[in-house]
Design a protein with these regions (language model features):
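Conserved cytosolic headpiece of P-type ATPases
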Residues: 1-167
Length: 167
């Protein structure tokens, strides 16, 4: 799963917004985000959990990219605090420029779940399965190429790209 953030306003206001999602093999503009779709809701929840920023009463604290994810959730009626209370963080590996990723550990549905956010190329190296409209299956080389092509397309449009995965 991939999330893209528009860089417009980044330099002048240090503010970002999420423009598109790439979920289950489809590019989805945020205006068409459907939280009744399990894959889209899953990605939204995980983008809140693997995130250190907050937006309390309009006061944004944290990295602009992470804040954009929290703001998108809020625009769709999801309170980050509620999701975080439901699945508290039990551990973390902060973002590291060598690893090019951040990892958080949560107890979800009675299981330990490590959520990882980071660079598409780095996460693809670690990914063994993919969520498609047909469910979860082994990721193929063709899947990886399609994701890499979408990543390149987003980058050519000036979008910052983040990938999410879990174990």
């Amino acid at each position: 799963s991939i999330i893209c953030s528009d860089k417009t306003g980044t330099l002048t206001q240090n503010k970002m917004t999420v423009e598109d999602y790439y979920v289950a093999g489809k590019r989805i503009p945020v205006s068409e985000l459907d939280l009744d779709d399990p894959a889209q809701r899953f990605l939204m929840d995980y983008s809140i959990l693997c995130n250190d920023s907050t937006n309390e009463n309009g006061v944004e604290i944290g990295d602009p990219t992470e804040t954009a994810l929290i703001n998108l959730a809020s625009q769709h009626g999801l309170a980050a605090a509620s999701i975080r209370n439901l699945y508290p963080r039990e551990g973390e590996l902060p973002f590291d420029s060598d690893r090019k990723m951040m990892s958080t550990l949560h107890r979800i549905d009675g299981k330990n779940r490590m959520i990882v956010k980071g660079a598409v190329d780095r996460l693809l190296e670690l990914t063994e399965q993919i969520w498609t409209h047909d469910g979860i299956r082994e990721i193929t080389e063709a899947d990886k190429i399609k994701i890499q092509q979408q990543n390149q397309s987003f980058s050519m449009e000036g979008l910052r790209v983040l990938a999410f995965t879990y174990r």
